[in-house]
Amino acid sequence: MENVTVVDHPLLKRDLTLLRREETPHGQFRKTVSDAAAILAYEAMRDIELEETSIETPLEQTTGYEIAEEVMVVPIMRAGLGMVDGFVRYVPEARVGHLGMQRDEETYRPVDYYSNIPSTIGHAHVFVVDPMLATGGSASFAIDHLKEEGGQDFTFACLVAAPEGVQKLREEHPDVPVVTAVLDRELDDNAFIRPGLGDAGDRIFGTRES
């Protein structure tokens, strides 16, 4: 699919297997989400801007590189919180915003309940993270909100995407690339991704028994 990167990596495939497995306990699930997010971050940040800098090694002067643009990570709460540590692992200076959203289980439409976004968003490359891209409603709504806050440069990163969600983002935000670990088959009648991995938020935080 255009503007979609499916990251092909053996460790990511291993992690996805753990995440899909119903009997994986929430502690291991939470750690695996973070580990998988770090692999996604490696790929999602491939085109991040660098600038040269002169440094001294123990032996001589040479040229090195520093990140030239501000990096911001905005998780769609609550499940997106599980991906933050993975994304800031390589860029500890990244700013982190928070956007609280939940899905209305009758209309399947997103409802926001919290927003705290750094004021520097207009100068940052913003990585919007959420484990699941299902209908695309929450992702599109979040990006709308962040653009209203002044954001201009975005990447959306998820662990599992449905074709319907990808299509919605392509239609409503064609300027936002999607990076995912896997593109699953479809949404079911309840707007859950199949085969999917269940409710990522519940499984990360252990808030509901299987």
Swiss-Prot record:
Pathway: Pyrimidine metabolism; UMP biosynthesis via salvage pathway; UMP from uracil: step 1/1. Allosterically activated by GTP. Its EC number is 2.4.2.9. 5-phospho-alpha-D-ribose 1-diphosphate binds at R78, R103, D130, P131, M132, L133, A134, T135, G136, G137, S138, D199. It catalyses: UMP + diphosphate = 5-phospho-alpha-D-ribose 1-diphosphate + uracil. Its cofactor is Mg(2+). It is an enzyme of class 2 (transferase). Signal peptide: none annotated. Binds 1 Mg(2+) ion per subunit. The magnesium is bound as Mg-PRPP. One of its GO terms (molecular function) is GTP binding. One of its GO terms (biological process) is UMP salvage. It holds the Pfam family UPRTase. Disulfide bonds: none annotated. Keywords: Allosteric enzyme, Glycosyltransferase, GTP-binding, Magnesium, Nucleotide-binding, Transferase. The keyword Phosphoprotein does not apply. Belongs to the UPRTase family. This is Uracil phosphoribosyltransferase. It comes from Salinibacter ruber (strain DSM 13855 / M31). The gene is upp.
